[in-house]
């Protein structure tokens, strides 16, 4: 059905970005066991940078990226519920790309 196809597209798009990020965004789940609804990742192999990522995302209007409070050591989580559309995933990936560049160069004004 429509929502199933949309969820496949959204999760495929995000997993492809994570997998192509040269290890900056790390999803530790075996590809054959990956969820289509909740996608976990760690940012730059660091809890501190993952927290910074979540805060900067909030400042840029992207919310709900915190991991489950019972397991915060896993970094970030994107929940791809039906209300999230492909444009939302594109916006998230654009932000992730910007954040990766900022952290790589530590350009302090990139988010201004």
Question: Residue spans of the language-model regions?
Answer:
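Structural signature of PLP-dependent enzymes
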Residues: 1-12
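Alpha-helical scaffold segments in carbohydrate-active enzymes
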Residues: 13-17
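Conserved C-terminal alpha-helix-loop-beta "cap" of PLP-dependent enzymes
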Residues: 19, 23-91
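Short amphipathic C-terminal alpha-helix that caps PH/PH-like domains
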Residues: 92-97
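Short, hydrophobic alpha-helical segments
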Residues: 100-103
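Short Gly/Ser/Thr- and charged-rich N-terminal loops/segments
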Residues: 108
